[in-house]
C-alpha cells in the first residue's frame, strides 16, 4: 500500500473520529474512571449498565467540557445497556447511524472519553460476526460482533464507528467475560424503546445455579433413558422461585417443560419468551429417582 493511500486513510479515520466524537460523552456515575456514552436521541444518552454504580448522581461531560446532569431512565443488565435522560435541553450533536451491518475485516474505531474528557480512540477491525447470541445473563443480541482492538478502561458505553464516522453499535466489556464486543444497532434501539416504556426489561428467573454433568451409564440404564447429561444444582437462592418449588441442592435437572436440558444455554433458550409469573414443569433426579416439580418464574433482579 502506497504512502499516499495510507495518508488518505489516516485523514479519513481522523475525520470519522472527529465527526462521531461530537456525540460521545463521559459518564460520571462511579467512583473512579468515568465510562462513555452516546447522545443517541434527542435528550437521551445510551451507556453501559455495569458502569452505573452511583445512578442517583449522574454527570455527563460533552465536547468542549460542557457538564450536564442526567437521570436514569432505565437499565438492563442482560444486555449491559442503560438509558439516561438529560435534566435540561442541550445542544449536542446526534450521530449518524450506519445502514449496513458490520462485516468481518472492516476497519472500525472504538471511541470514548478519557478521565480528562478528551476524545480517545482505538482502531482495529471487526474480528467476527455471527448470528443471534444469548448473553450469559439471558439477553438477546441480534448479532454477535467481536472486535480485534483494545477496548481500554472507560471505553464501555462508547460507540463503534465505521471509516465514515457512522455508528455501528455500542461497545462493552460487561458481557462475554471481559472480551470486547459490540451491541448492534437493532439490539440497542429495541432495548432503548423497552426501557423508555417500562424502565426495565422483565426477564424470567429460576433462582438457582447449575453446572453440566454426565449421567452414569448405570443410572441411564435404570431410568431407561437415552439422556447422557443433566444439570447439577449447585446453589438455590433462599426464598427464590426454585426454592419455593422444592428444588434442592444436589438435584439433577433433566428436563424443563418436557425438553431435555444439557447446559444452561438450553434453559435460557427455552425460557426466552416467558414472563415472570408464568409456570414451568421441571423434571429432576433426586437420589436416583425422577421427580416432577412446578416452578413459578420470578423476575431477574437488577444487579
For each predicted feature, which ranges?
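C-terminal cap/linker of serine protease catalytic domains
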Residues: 1-17, 114, 163, 167-228, ...
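Conserved active-site neighborhood of the chymotrypsin/trypsin-like protease fold
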Residues: 3-5, 21, 26-120, 144-145, ...
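Short, small/polar residue-rich loop motifs at catalytic or cofactor-binding pockets
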Residues: 31-34, 152-156, 230, 239-240, ...
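PDZ/PDZ-like domain micro-motif
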Residues: 154-159, 216-224, 237-255, 270
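Active-site region of chymotrypsin-like
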Residues: 21-23, 82, 86-95, 120-178, ...
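A structural signal for short beta-strand/turn segments enriched in small hydrophobics and glycine
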Residues: 43, 105-111, 160, 165, ...
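Conserved PDZ fold ligand-binding element
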Residues: 44-46, 168, 242-265
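Residue-level recognition of beta-strand microenvironments
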Residues: 42, 73-75, 129, 150, ...
